[in-house]
């Protein structure tokens, strides 16, 4: 069974109801296939702070993510981070810090990253990436 780690931008699209692609995929996946991670939590909670009523936005994020399995940045992810960052630096293809942390968590836990930002994630060696925006 393929398990997915949705990047922050995929959740934002879902929360704003702007696209049906993410919603359609989520409707056909079992709850056990969809996961989250501490970095995505941090980014979504930070984004909630930008709204007029941040408490309401945080509640929406919690209702959405709390039922999902959560992966933290642990030692296995740290090892993947070190290898990936070294390879990216050597190739001159740096990606954003949070994206690399998310990618490392996905690699450590055999997850496929779902993101609208596939160009950046596809630079990470060995990472499986899908774009559900269409």
Would you name each region that the model predicts?
Residues 11-12, 41-44, 78, 121:
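A generic structural signal for short hydrophobic patches within well-formed alpha-helices
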Residues 2, 46, 68-114:
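Active-site neighborhoods of divalent-metal-dependent phosphate/nucleic-acid chemistry enzymes
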Residues 1-36, 46-63, 90:
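Short, well-structured N-terminal submotif of metal-dependent ribonuclease cores
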Residues 23, 37, 41, 54, ...:
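A general structural signal for well-ordered alpha-helical segments in protein cores
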Residues 100, 104-134:
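Acidic, metal-binding active-site segment of PIN/NYN-like and related structure-specific nucleases
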Residues 7, 37, 94-96, 117-118:
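Histidine- and aromatic-rich ligand-binding microenvironments
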